[in-house]
Amino acid sequence: MAAKEVKFGREARERLLRGVDILANAVKVTLGPKGRNVVIDKSFGAPRITKDGVSVAKEIELEDKFENMGAQMLREVASKTNDIAGDGTTTATVLGQAIVQEGVKAVAAGMNPMDLKRGIDAAVEEVVGNLFKKAKKIQTSAEIAQVGTISANGAAEIGKMIADAMEKVGNEGVITVEEAKTAETELEVVEGMQFDRGYLSPYFVTNADKMVADLDDPYILIHEKKLSNLQSLLPVLEAVVQSGKPLLIIAEDVEGEALATLVVNKLRGGLKIAAVKAPGFGDRRKAMLEDIAILTSGQVISEDVGIKLENVTLDMLGRAKKVNISKENTTIIDGAGKKAEINARVNQIKVQIEETTSDYDREKLQERLAKLAGGVAVIRVGGATEVEVKEKKDRVDDALNATRAAVEEGIVAGGGTALLRAANALAIKGSNPDQEAGINIVRRALQAPARQIATNAGEEAAIIVGKVLENNADTFGYNTATGQFGDLIALGIVDPVKVVRSALQNAASIASLLITTEAMVAEVPKKDTPMPPMPGGGMGGMGGMDF
């Protein structure tokens, strides 16, 4: 076991604080509409330029083990806030640094760290309650666009695009952000349920120009196993032919004789048909087939539930207004499923999302939820260079997450103003002087984001904060982008409550841990031993030779 170095008390906290300051000072320059860029060196390719706090925090690793512990603890604040709210990472870092700095000073002055922590926790709880009280619910598409614009560092076109996407796919719909191949940023919306399986044979195509198969008002057969011969399927095929409707077969696979027979029937014009493979694999495939069945009011034909192919009747098949099949994707539009059954399935998936511990499973469940609930929107981010596209994509991701958070818990005045007001309204008292000091630490720290936003814009922070606090209106604040004072909610300068709340709670949680630290243990760095020199002299038995 390697030897360890141990630091105690004041020295330990000072080393932690040094690490916290290094990370926070690099991250906080990105805060606000006039936040500065941070350039990050990459081991290959061009350096990355970003204004995204969590991206900067993730890149920082310090040589000194003890300082690095402080930096990593503060990085955890940014990451946790990003996981919960998807934005607010820089605000969380600024708050964390402010609480740690004040807390370490208080402990050095002889105060009880545990009482300080109790005071900090009580103050944070009070502030969060105040934020919820002041929150304004989001109703209109214009308000959604405002939130998106603020989080995208003032890019109005990004805010509008996110608002359009949410309007089209609903708040539950999936909105993904991808890098575009062109210089333009564009929005593409896929309505209905789409899965990544195309037609099994190009002979199923109905539109040769676009190479797609369009089926209007089709029946949909959902089968769990492979189809290799059509004998057992003949009764239902005949019933479909007599109905005069097209048929879509979704099965694990359709192969050999079965596929050949379907193609021949399609080419002869006797049956308008298409076949696709079932989406997903294993248990996920079963769940997705069940989703399709509920969406189209059909049944999954499976021997597990005792249904054999030869016994299938028309009323067991799903229905939809339209199905569009390309080489790679199948889209079912306007399925005939009952609203109540679809909602029950949506709620069931929501419960699974909350219970799962795997990020991969959560992502897949959210995709399923979106496909059932409304559709999928894709924002393709374009730019002149790869560096620009990556920087813009960071901002779009932030804006999207902030917008979702705003729809969930409402909005408050932005620009750090809500926290300034909450600090003024903080009226609780501690049960002893040390707890009172903890409450005052939070009261002072709540000014830090507003001060930092002003500093980044080249303003005098103390003057700006003073002017804001002279006016008692809750939503009165400073618009850094235009340099004017006014009603921030009316001006569209807003922050989602979830983002502000998560930033404060996570910052206080980690800061309290750092303040109450009394010892630190790290490995002693290994000294590199130099390589021994090569032994001198020639090789034996080589005497008499000149070199």
Curated annotation (Swiss-Prot):
Keywords: ATP-binding, Chaperone, Cytoplasm, Isomerase, Nucleotide-binding, Stress response. Gene3D superfamilies: GroEL, GroEL-like equatorial domain, TCP-1-like chaperonin intermediate domain. The keyword Isomerase applies. This is Chaperonin GroEL. It is found in: Cytoplasm. Pfam families: Cpn60_TCP1. Its EC number is 5.6.1.7. Together with its co-chaperonin GroES, plays an essential role in assisting protein folding. The GroEL-GroES system forms a nano-cage that allows encapsulation of the non-native substrate proteins and provides a physical environment optimized to promote and accelerate protein folding. Forms a cylinder of 14 subunits composed of two heptameric rings stacked back-to-back. Interacts with the co-chaperonin GroES. It catalyses: ATP + H2O + a folded polypeptide = ADP + phosphate + an unfolded polypeptide. It comes from Bartonella quintana (strain Toulouse). NCBIfam families: GroEL, PRK00013.1, PRK12849.1, PRK12850.1, PRK12851.1.
